[in-house]
């Protein structure tokens, strides 16, 4: 593999139907250029997330972010596990995505069973808008989940969903060998392995 940018998603991915190209072109890179992201670009991504659908219009998503080389960066970056620090240190910004587990309606508090589901929809909007602006995003599940609520200052009725690294995609020469081999768009399962008419088919799992 070249040490330059990897093959385009079009060479590795193919849709069976007329899906808009951005869904296929977006993929999660670890190879990021250490450039600053303008605040306006980051806010545009958050604004896209804002329009996601949610149960009761509760909008349970919350985003906590830090630009690299700012005082908050070290606190957020320190939550990542060692393996993820090996590549995420070059990100332009880190974002922790959090969901609220309840909402208040007419002075009464109700649980929201779909808080994670709805926040996932907001994350998709964030990631797709970032792609349209020329940025790559990668969700990070490997972080200190026990410490994160305290570091982020969360009340008990909030849940940390994921961390996200965002930045311009770069060449892979600075990546560890184990990451270089993985730095390519991933494939997807065929439709008939997860879409069923009328009844679930366990054989496909």
Predicted regions and their residues:
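Acidic, surface-exposed loops and disordered segments
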Residues: 1-205
């Amino acid at each position: 593999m070249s040490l330059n940018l990897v093959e385009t998603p079009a060479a590795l991915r193919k849709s069976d139907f007329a899906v808009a190209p951005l869904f296929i072109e977006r993929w999660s890179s670890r190879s990021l250029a250490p450039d600053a992201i303008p605040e306006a670009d980051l806010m545009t991504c958050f604004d896209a997330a804002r329009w996601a659908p949610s149960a009761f219009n509760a909008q349970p998503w919350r985003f906590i972010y830090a630009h690299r080389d700012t005082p908050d960066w070290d606190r957020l970056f320190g939550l990542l596990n060692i393996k993820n620090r090996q590549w995420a240190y070059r990100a332009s910004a880190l974002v922790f995505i959090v969901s609220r587990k309840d909402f208040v309606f007419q002075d009464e508090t109700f649980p929201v069973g779909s808080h994670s589901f709805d926040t996932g929809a907001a994350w998709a909007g964030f990631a797709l808008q970032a792609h349209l602006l020329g940025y790559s995003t990668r969700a990070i599940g490997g972080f200190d989940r026990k410490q994160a609520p305290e570091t982020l200052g969360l009340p008990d009725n909030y849940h940390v969903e994921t961390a996200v690294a965002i930045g311009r995609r770069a060449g892979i020469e600075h990546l560890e060998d184990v990451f270089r081999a993985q730095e390519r768009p991933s494939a997807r399962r065929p439709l008939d392995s997860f879409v069923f008419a009328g009844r679930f088919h366990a054989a496909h799992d």
